[in-house]
């Protein structure tokens, strides 16, 4: 699964259908980040089964 955050931000996103999913000027990684925080919208989508993930 891919995780993205905007450059200069500490909030990581992991649902491609998140309204704040970064599409430019971002950092991407393949594993769960060990610093920063996970986006609340992404976590809500994950919990209710509507999170679209990028492999």
What does each model-found stretch correspond to?
Residues 1-7:
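Short N-terminal "domain-start" leader segments
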Residues 5, 30-31, 51-52:
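Extended terminal accessory/targeting regions
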Residues 26-37:
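Short linker/helix segments within small regulatory modules
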